[in-house]
UniProtKB/Swiss-Prot annotation:
The gene is rbfA. Keywords: Cytoplasm, Ribosome biogenesis. It is found in: Cytoplasm. PROSITE patterns: RBFA. Monomer. Binds 30S ribosomal subunits, but not 50S ribosomal subunits or 70S ribosomes. This is Ribosome-binding factor A. Coiled coil: none annotated. It comes from Pseudomonas fluorescens (strain SBW25). Belongs to the RbfA family.
Length: 131
């Protein structure tokens, strides 16, 4: 029987909590907006971690790219701080990525709302009622 909750998932969850606090507390760069860590994927060998983020208030691709660049530049510092907080033999290398799923989800929700609004504007015909 497979483990329901693997070690890498537990490490990822703890890293997500710790990194959220560290970024808020330690990263003072004004180019980084309000960062939300949406997910952390840790490799099986615990050598690398992909950190997926969204940045509140930054909609343009340039601003988002700048935030990612700043966070990737601070990855070594954040990794060192994580090592102090977490009790791991080795802390994974951090790689920050923008999480586009939130933007895609909002876009799909807007499309659904628009389709529902268009359907409510068209009266149903008797042929539709028979089906």
């Amino acid at each position: 029987m497979a483990k329901e909750y693997s070690r890498t998932q537990r490490i990822g969850d703890q890293m997500q909590r710790e990194l959220a606090q560290l970024i808020r507390r330690e990263v003072k760069d004004p180019r980084v907006g309000l960062v939300t860590i949406t997910a952390v994927e840790v490799s099986r060998d615990v050598g690398h971690a992909k950190i997926f983020i969204t940045v509140m208030g930054q909609d343009s691709a340039e601003e988002i790219a700048q935030s990612i660049k700043v966070l990737n530049a601070a990855a070594g510092f954040l990794r060192m701080q994580l090592a102090r907080e977490m009790k791991l033999r080795s802390v994974p290398q951090l790689h920050f990525h923008y999480d586009e799923s939130v933007v895609r989800g909002a876009h799909l929700s807007a499309l659904i709302e628009r389709a529902v609004a268009e359907d409510s504007q068209h009266p149903s015909t008797p042929e539709d009622a028979k089906e």
